[in-house]
Amino acid sequence: MAVYKVSFLAHLLVLGMYLLVSTVEHANACTKECGNLGYGICPGSEGSPENPICTNCCSGYKGCNYYYANGTFICEGTSDPKNPNICPSYCDPQIAYSKCPRSEGKTIIYPTGCTTCCTGYKGCYYFGQDGEFVCEGESIEPKGCTKECDPRVAYMTCPSSGLAKLNQVCVNCCSAGEGCKLYDNDGSLLCTGEPQSISTA
């Protein structure tokens, strides 16, 4: 009798752990909806001793450090992308280059496509169509997309399929492949898949 009791408890424990892992994975995945963002600002490292940038400590971004051509630190930027400083527009001839947390990629993201606050990069700031600050990105790396089917999707076309209509597909705006276009029943474009979209297993 004791053996059956232990076995039953062991099964309950395994089931509980499985449910917990599934819940955590689902919570970490971003939703299927696209954001309605206007643009994003991702301060990135710019310039070099041979190709200096045009900026100054006032207009330089917070979190970015600015240096002389010989590598000596000058200042940290003081302008918050959420609420930029009103600064003189002159170039400080002493500043040659900057080092920022996100050292790769574009500084200005426009348009943002299907990016949301969840899938946007940490250290990037996202703004609405009206130019008002919306959020800072939450992902250190692109977050996994939920595999939930978006019921609005009637068909999609993808470059890999020669743009033929693919019907009865289980997909959403986050998990769609790069360049794939999702359409609703009346033929209106819902969204276009982006390179950063990855799906969870």
UniProtKB/Swiss-Prot annotation:
Keywords linked to the UniProt accession: Disulfide bond, Protease inhibitor, Repeat, Serine protease inhibitor, Signal
Annotated site residues (Reactive bond for trypsin) in this chain: 32-33, 147-148
Domain of life: Eukaryota
Annotated signal peptide: 1-23
InterPro entries with a match to the protein in the record: Prot_inh_I20, Protease_inhibitor_I20
Any Pfam family the entry gives: Prot_inhib_II
GO molecular function, one term: serine-type endopeptidase inhibitor activity
Induction of the gene: By viroid infection.
Sequence repeat boundaries on the chain: 27-83, 84-143, 144-199
Disulphide bond pairs: 30-118, 34-114, 42-124, 54-91, 57-75, 58-87, 64-100, 117-135
Gene3D superfamilies found in the cross-reference section: 3.30.60.30
Coiled-coil parts of chain: none
Family the entry assigns: Belongs to the protease inhibitor I20 (potato type II proteinase inhibitor) family.
Protein name, per record: Proteinase inhibitor type-2 CEVI57
Gene behind this protein: CEVI57
